[in-house]
């Protein structure tokens, strides 16, 4: 487990991505980092991820005034900004396992005190070959957050309060 940091950061050509729709922009940027995936796969995965589930508003810039915009990050399926990563990651995991000919079950462990749990459960629910267990502190989430996690449907999910 842990976090991975690249040895160097690729330079993103801002002019090349200006004007792209969010799924295209996401695929272009992610492709700079995840070079083991084909650009075609990333484009398809981003389109599938940020399309209908985000109501056509992934990366929506809401005008505040003539020159000020607000980036709205709550248009995902759980209304949490974490949907942006946790809806794409399962597709990346399944593709990586396929490319590496890995067939064993994968267990995702998540610890949360709030929105991450629901976003992770929603993203990974019913993904073949993947189990997810979400741990949360008893009394450490809001009642709404607890209910969001507890009512998530899926055959491969475990929710554990500690």
Region locations from a protein language model:
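A structural-propensity feature for long, helix-poor, extended segments
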Residues: 148-158
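A structural signal for isolated positions on well-ordered beta-strands in alpha/beta enzyme cores
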Residues: 107, 131-133
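Conserved beta-strand segments of alpha/beta enzyme cores
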Residues: 69, 131, 156-158
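Well-ordered mid-protein domain cores that form the structural environment of catalytic cofactors
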Residues: 69-126
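N-terminal entrance/gating region of PLP-dependent enzymes' catalytic architecture
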Residues: 4-79
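Hydrophobic, small-residue-rich alpha-helical packing segments that form membrane-like cores
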Residues: 133-144, 154
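Conserved small/polar residues in nucleotide/adenosyl-binding loops
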Residues: 160-162
